[in-house]
């Protein structure tokens, strides 16, 4: 995948791990499902996040009227924390802690990419992670679910090292990237 179609960096480069872009969108696409008249939040599910992200979105002010229990501050904080946690899990080569926030397809894709890194004897480092802002862009309904879409602006340092030699495979240990998802 071409991560340029999902994220933008100030230096014109792309994040070496295109799945992070997709992952952020999946984490952002928290779905609200009506179950027995009660609303319950869950991640991604079977919702097509790309279709939701490209649709004309309704303003968040309408959503807060629909779901009075919705807390925008709580969601933006959760998204920031999940972004950092996801980067940390990837670097530790153990993505199981973020499994509840991933669709089956996304988790499988991430796991396959992680296995390839392990087979090559490489570790991808994402350091000096900062979520600069989380902006809830709006919401839409898809398949009976409410899908919320957000834009995250982040700063990272992204590079890959060879596990055996410690030599730099790709990226830059010092160059900051400013990303928008």
Task: Label each residue range with its predicted role.
Residues 2-81, 162:
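Juxtamembrane and targeting peptides
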Residues 22-25, 95-98, 129-131, 156, ...:
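Weak global preference for isoleucine
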Residues 22, 90-93, 106, 115, ...:
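Generic detector of bulky aromatic hydrophobic side chains
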Residues 1-2, 121:
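Glycine-centered flexibility motif
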Residues 118-158:
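Long, low-complexity alpha-helical segments
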Residues 48-129, 135:
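Core segments of small alpha/beta cavity-forming domains
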Residues 14, 32-33, 64, 73-76, ...:
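Residue-identity detector for threonine
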Residues 27-36, 141-181:
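Exposed beta-sheet edge and beta->alpha loop/turn motif
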């Amino acid at each position: 995948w071409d991560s340029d179609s999902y994220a933008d960096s100030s230096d014109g480069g792309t994040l070496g791990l295109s799945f992070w872009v997709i992952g952020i969108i999946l984490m952002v696409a928290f779905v609200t499902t009506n179950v027995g008249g009660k609303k319950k939040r869950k991640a991604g599910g079977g919702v097509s996040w790309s279709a939701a992200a490209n649709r004309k979105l309704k303003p968040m002010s309408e959503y807060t009227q629909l779901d009075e229990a919705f807390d925008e501050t709580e969601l933006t904080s959760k998204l920031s924390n999940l972004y950092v946690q996801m980067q940390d899990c990837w670097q530790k080569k153990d993505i199981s802690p973020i499994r509840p926030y991933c669709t089956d397809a996304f988790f499988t894709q991430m796991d396959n990419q992680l296995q390839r890194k392990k087979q090559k004897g490489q570790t991808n480092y994402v350091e000096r992670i900062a979520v600069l802002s989380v902006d809830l862009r709006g919401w839409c309904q898809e398949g009976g679910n409410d899908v919320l879409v957000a834009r995250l602006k982040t700063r990272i340092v992204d590079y890959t090292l060879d596990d055996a030699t410690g030599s730099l495979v790709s990226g830059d240990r010092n160059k900051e990237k400013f990303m928008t998802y």
